[in-house]
Design a protein with these regions (language model features):
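N-terminal accessory scaffold of Fe(II)-dependent oxygenases
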Residues: 2-344, 352-390
Length: 390
């Protein structure tokens, strides 16, 4: 009979040998670093870490998508990595909220909680280039706090704006502008709806995988810059409601407050630009953003009439491939990215963005004025003539 203690000791030795061997393999595969001229050991470790974590599991399809390697500073000519807008909307039609397995991320993504990576992100922000951040403690707190019951309670006392569309497309329109422009007919209807009812519809849309031809509802709320932490939005998102300049609000005096958009599966916000630096925090769910630099303005069919209710928005239906082809989208530069809960996307001033809600989603953003050198403004003025700050 084999002694129990001897057998246990033998098993333990085998376990230690196996785990030790695995540790050695992992060390050589993952934790050895490459020596770069002019790059510190710490920075080199970050670069290798980015290779190890160059993929992520998408919350929608559980498909592993690739991510680009981490950059310490903006390269002169190789970032952003563009594809043609026609290729972008053809490979993944905006009317389809399901990400294809071939989707690749090309936009930089930095760890906000890491001081070194945060310094990289600051360089990209100052260069007016788009990027994403993650591991932001204040934002992660909100992603956990804003569950259904919390939002239902808070929304009882919040003012909201709800739009209805017979399809999944929502063209922005301003009811305060001249409605007589070309016998203007609003593209969506304003409706009265309680948040609880809207949430039920949004959750059902995910469950049944609603199509682009069904009626959609877009729920919007927000607070002004003068809210001063009075509402739950500015209290919970204090990074966007600061009295002192920070990474997210670089010019408090020009802060536009906080706008929150509650989206349901498939909702498309048509392409447009904003005149301020834009930090977009994804609180729940995920959205797809297609970005275009300001110099592409002339090719995007942007409404230039300052009196038009949909001023600064594209009149082109990007999900209509025939329109995209005839409008020359094959010569338009585009970036395609998915922003997931807990991430913040930086959209530089005057960059165009086209937004698709991939599922029930909550997104809050804050804009804080144009960059010091006014990057992007000249291209927009050459394209549209007079430009109204927005």
């Amino acid at each position: 009979m084999v002694n129990t203690k001897t057998r246990d000791a033998s098993c333990l030795r085998r376990f230690i040998c196996v785990t030790s061997a695995l540790s050695v393999i992992c060390f050589f595969l993952g934790y050895s670093y490459v020596v770069f001229y002019g790059v510190s050991e710490e920075e080199s470790q970050h670069l290798n870490a980015s290779k190890l974590t160059s993929s992520f599991v998408d919350i929608l399809s559980k498909t592993i998508f690739e991510r680009p390697e981490l950059l310490m500073e903006p390269p002169e000519d190789s970032y952003p990595v563009y594809a043609s807008l026609l290729e972008t909307v053809t490979k993944w039609n905006p009317d389809d909220p399901e990400p294809p397995t071939t989707f690749k991320e090309t936009i930089q993504r930095f760890n906000y909680s890491d001081e070194l990576e945060r310094s990289y992100a600051e360089k990209f922000r100052n260069a007016e280039l788009p990027f994403k951040m993650y591991d932001i403690p204040d934002i992660l707190m909100v992603t956990r706090k804003w569950d259904d019951e919390y939002l239902k309670q808070k929304m009882k006392y919040a003012s909201a704006h709800v739009e209805e569309s017979k399809s999944n497309h929502f063209m922005y329109w301003n009811g305060n502008r001249d409605r007589n422009v070309r016998q203007y007919v609003p593209p969506t209807d304003l409706v009265s709806m309680k948040f609880d009812d809207w949430l039920e519809i949004a959750k059902k849309a995910d469950e049944i995988k609603s199509t682009n031809s069904t009626t959609h509802y877009y729920f919007m709320t927000g607070v002004s810059a003068s809210d001063n932490l009075r509402s739950y939005i500015s209290q919970d998102l204090s990074l966007f409601s600061t009295k002192k300049n920070n990474f997210f609000v670089s010019n408090v005096a020009a802060n536009k407050g906080i706008q929150c958009r509650f989206g349901m599966r498939g909702i498309i916000a048509e392409a447009h630009f904003d005149s301020g630096r834009n930090m977009v925090a994804m609180i729940k769910g995920a959205k797809r953003y297609i970005l275009n630099p300001p110099h592409e303005c002339k090719k995007l069919g942007i409404i230039s009439d300052l009196k038009h209710p949909s001023y600064r928005h594209s009149i082109i239906d990007w999900s209509d491939i025939d329109q995209a082809t005839s409008r020359g989208f094959d010569s338009v530069n585009a970036i395609d990215t998915i922003v997931e809960a807990g991430e913040v996307l930086y959209i530089p001033s005057y960059w165009f963005h086209y937004i698709v809600s991939l599922q029930y989603s909550v997104q809050c953003n804050s804009r804080s004025g144009s960059p010091p050198n006014g990057e992007g403004q000249t291209e927009i003025e050459e394209c549209l003539g007079s430009v109204r700050k927005w």
